[in-house]
């Protein structure tokens, strides 16, 4: 049986259903303070701060080694999707908490984040997810998970006026459309911007 190419797509007249874009919750500055205060170990404080200030993926976080951290420049090299290397930056608070955590370590594992008990293995993605979920429940915070930190960092950066191309570079997105999903800013920010620039 012969096979031919279809000249016209049968799907061309079918319109995409418009789904309402939901503004997903982000972690507020107040939530971050509560999460920090709720931590009972230095590792978790350092982990939360690094996730919040860099916007890295949880898979990138657990792959980090001590040697990847440049404290003087407050930056680290991560390997994203498809093993693409990129540089990300962390704030002064993260630097202090990371230094305190590393000073407290008694193991020689090259991994940046390890389990709290012997044999001090490299922390796994599931370990980070479970820890954050437990912390969120303890503090009655709604659905605390690693990606929420990434979304919060991106939303914060966009809200404060960081150009979308720079946010794209920090997040390691190959397509700007992916980054644009974080640009669904809340209405109060739109109103404030209108007052600042238009009114």
Regions picked out by a protein language model, each given a short descriptive name:
Residues 1-199:
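Conserved catalytic core of the tyrosine transesterase superfamily
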